[in-house]
C-alpha cells in the first residue's frame, strides 16, 4: 500500500440532504461528481461527542483540525470548562483568586453568545458572578457574534446580559462586534477601535441595548457593530484586572498583544495593562496566567511522520493557516523536523463574498509544487466553504464551492500523475445550509456529517460510523508507518 499522501480539508462543506439554499448542491462541481462516481466515499461525524464537544454542539475548525491531526477525540475546552463551572470549582482557581485579591476593579471581556466556538455566554455569566460575589467592582465588555450564531440574535443575548448585570450590580460597560474586537488577520485599525473603546474613548450611549437595535435599523448586524460604551463608563485603569473568557485562542491574540505587549508598535497606545488572565493559553509568548492549561497531546500525525524521517508540507491561506499548523499539530506552534509551512495571504477584502475564490488558486499551486517536489505528506485547507458561508451570501457561497472544485480537479490530476494517494474531507459543514425554512440567513456552522473520499492502493471501501479522528491512522496506513496506540482506527 505504501504511497505518498495528500490530505485535503475543504473547510465548511458538509452533506445536507435538503437541496434548498444548499450552496454545495447548487454549485457546478465536475470534480466532486467524478469523485462520487469513481472513488470510495462515505460520511463522517464532525459535531458533538464525536469531536469532544457537548452532544448536539456544532463542530468548528479548531476542534476539527485537532481531531484530524491527533487521530483521537480530545475533550475540548468547552466541555472541560462546563464541568468545572457545574462543580463550583472555577472560583477555587488559584490564578483567578490571585487576580481578584490584587485588583479591586475587574473587566470581563469576551464573545457573548451560545455559539460555543470561541466562547459561551454561560462562562461569561459565571465569571461575572464569581467576581461580583468576591466584592470586586466588575465591568462587562460584550463582543457581539452574528457569525457562529444568526446575524441578529445579539439582541436577545445582550438583553439577557444587561438584565444579568443589573441584578448582580455589575457595570455593563461596552459593546462591540467581533469584526473589530476579534480580528486575527493583523488589521490593526479594527483592533485599535476596540482598544479605544476599552479605554473609554468610544461613542457614548445611554443604553447599549437600544444602541444595538439602532444598529440593526441601519442594517448593521451583530458581527459588525461599531464599538460603543455606556455613557457612565470612564475606561480601564492600568492597575485594573482583565479576564478574557474566550477559550479559543486565535481571535483573542491580537487584542491581548495590544493591551499587554511592551514591544507592540502597530499604533500608539496610551496605556499598557499587566494584570491579565486568559481562559486558555492564547500564545506561549505571552507568559500570562491562564485558567485552563493546555492538555499535552503526543504522537500526533505530524509528529509520527517527522519521527519517521519523512517530509511534510502544511499549507493554507491566512484565515486557516493556524488550523493546518497549530491546531493540526495538537496545539503546538513549533516547526517539526522536515516540516515545511507555506502561508498564502488571504485577500484584503472586508468580507469574503466580495472575493469568493479567496486565495484558493494560489493555495492549489502550493500543493502542486509540493507534489512535484516529492513531499511525503501534504495537508492543505481550502477556506472558501466556511469563510464565504459565514457571510450568508448564497450566490457567493456557490462560487466558493466552484473555486474549491476547480482546485480539487487540478490537485487530483497532479496526484495521480505522481502516484500520490489522497484523502478529501471537511472539518465541519457550513455552506450547505445558507438559510432556514423561514428565509433567515444562516451564517453559522452546521451539525451535518461531511464527505470523505479515499483514493489509495488497495482501498475499495470505507468503514461505517467513522469520524474525523479516524483520518490520521488512515494517512499513516497509506504511508506504511506504525499507528500509535493513542490513535483511533483507520477508515479502511
For each feature predicted by the language model, list its residue ranges.
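Feature captures the catalytic ectodomains and active-site-proximal regions of enzymes
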Residues: 1-492
Amino acid at each position: 500500500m505504501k504511497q505518498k499522501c495528500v490530505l485535503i480539508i475543504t473547510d465548511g462543506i458538509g452533506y445536507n440532504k435538503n437541496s434548498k439554499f444548499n450552496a454545495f448542491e447548487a454549485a457546478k462541481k465536475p470534480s466532486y461528481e467524478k469523485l462520487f462516481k469513481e472513488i470510495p466515499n462515505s460520511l463522517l461525524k464532525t459535531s458533538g461527542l464525536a469531536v469532544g464537544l457537548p452532544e448536539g454542539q456544532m463542530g468548528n475548525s479548531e476542534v476539527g483540525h485537532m481531531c484530524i491531526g491527533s487521530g483521537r477525540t480530545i475533550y475540548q475546552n468547552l466541555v472541560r470548562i462546563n464541568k468545572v463551572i457545574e462543580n463550583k470549582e472555577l472560583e477555587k482557581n488559584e490564578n483567578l483568586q490571585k487576580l481578584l485579591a490584587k485588583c479591586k476593579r475587574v473587566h470581563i471581556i469576551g464573545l457573548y453568545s451560545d455559539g460555543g466556538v470561541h466562547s459561551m455566554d454561560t462562562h461569561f455569566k459565571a465569571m461575572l458572578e464569581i467576581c461580583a460575589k468576591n466584592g470586586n467592582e466588575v465591568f462587562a465588555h460584550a463582543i457581539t457574534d452574528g457569525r457562529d450564531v444568526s446575524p441578529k440574535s445579539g439582541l436577545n443575548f445582550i438583553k439577557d446580559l444587561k438584565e444579568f448585570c443589573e441584578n448582580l450590580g455589575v457595570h455593563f460597560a461596552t459593546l462591540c462586534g467581533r469584526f473589530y474586537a476579534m480580528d486575527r488577520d493583523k488589521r490593526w485599525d479594527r483592533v485599535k477601535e476596540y482598544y479605544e473603546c476599552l479605554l473609554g474613548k468610544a461613542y457614548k450611549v445611554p443604553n447599549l441595548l437600544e444602541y444595538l437595535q439602532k444598529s440593526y435599523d441601519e442594517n448593521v448586524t451583530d458581527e459588525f457593530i461599531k464599538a460603543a460604551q455606556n455613557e457612565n463608563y470612564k475606561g480601564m485603569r492600568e492597575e485594573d484586572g482583565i479576564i478574557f473568557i474566550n477559550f479559543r485562542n486565535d481571535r483573542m491574540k491580537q487584542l491581548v498583544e495590544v493591551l499587554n505587549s511592551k514591544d507592540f508598535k502597530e499604533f500608539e497606545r496610551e496605556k499598557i495593562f499587566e494584570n491579565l488572565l486568559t481562559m486558555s493559553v492564547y500564545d506561549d509568548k505571552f507568559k500570562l496566567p491562564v485558567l485552563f492549561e493546555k492538555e499535552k497531546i503526543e504522537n500526533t500525525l505530524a509528529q509520527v511522520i517527522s519521527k519517521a524521517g519523512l517530509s511534510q508540507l502544511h499549507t493554507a491561506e491566512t484565515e486557516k493557516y493556524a488550523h493546518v499548523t497549530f491546531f493540526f499539530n495538537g496545539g503546538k506552534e513549533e516547526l517539526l523536523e522536515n516540516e515545511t509551512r507555506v502561508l498564502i495571504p488571504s485577500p484584503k477584502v472586508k468580507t469574503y463574498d466580495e472575493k469568493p475564490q479567496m486565495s484558493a488558486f494560489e493555495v492549489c499551486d502550493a500543493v502542486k509544487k509540493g507534489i512535484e517536489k516529492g513531499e511525503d505528506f501534504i495537508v492543505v485547507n481550502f477556506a472558501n466553504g466556511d469563510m464565504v458561508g459565514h457571510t450568508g451570501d448564497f450566490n457567493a457561497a456557490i462560487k466558493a464551492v466552484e473555486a474549491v472544485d476547480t482546485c480539487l480537479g487540478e490537485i487530483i490530476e497532479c496526484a495521480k500523475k505522481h502516484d500520490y494517494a489522497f484523502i478529501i474531507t471537511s472539518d465541519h459543514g457550513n455552506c450547505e445550509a445558507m438559510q432556514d425554512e423561514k428565509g433567515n440567513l444562516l451564517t453559522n456552522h452546521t451539525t451535518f456529517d461531511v464527505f470523505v473520499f479515499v483514493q489509495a492502493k488497495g482501498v475499495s471501501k470505507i468503514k461505517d460510523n467513522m469520524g474525523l479522528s479516524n483520518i490520521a491512522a488512515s494517512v499513516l496506513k497509506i504511508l506504511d508507518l506504525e499507528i500509535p496506540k493513542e490513535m483511533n482506527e483507520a477508515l479502511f
